[in-house]
Amino acid sequence: MAQKFFSAEWAKDALEVERAASDQIYKRFKNPAGFTHVLALEVADHPGVVTHIQYDQGRSVTWTTDLFDEDQVWARFSANLDAWRAAAEGKAKASNLVMAGRIKLTKGAMKDALENAAPFDRLVQTFGGVETNWEI
């Protein structure tokens, strides 16, 4: 059954898909063992639609709509729904959408985003592995 994009149910399914791709994502981090961070992902044209994914040493441990405290968020990416969908469906790389300004880095350093563009691309590609209801 299709889950609403970035809903709690969707995040649960997405974590399973991400974990299936975990080895591919891990090897793409600049420093996987040091990648212990929380990423915030939000839908700019649907305020309040936000998920957080937590990594510990380059491996996902939590993907949730129960948000972490802001001081724990290392990077925040915000995009309209159509940009997230384009990246999820393989029509565009997430990192290219960041460079084009369609996915905005609203917290964190662009240097870190660039250094970890490949794992971010693979992470967002995993969205396509979740049966998604894009009507949010």
Residue ranges and their predicted role:
Residues M1-I136:
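Feature captures hydrophobic
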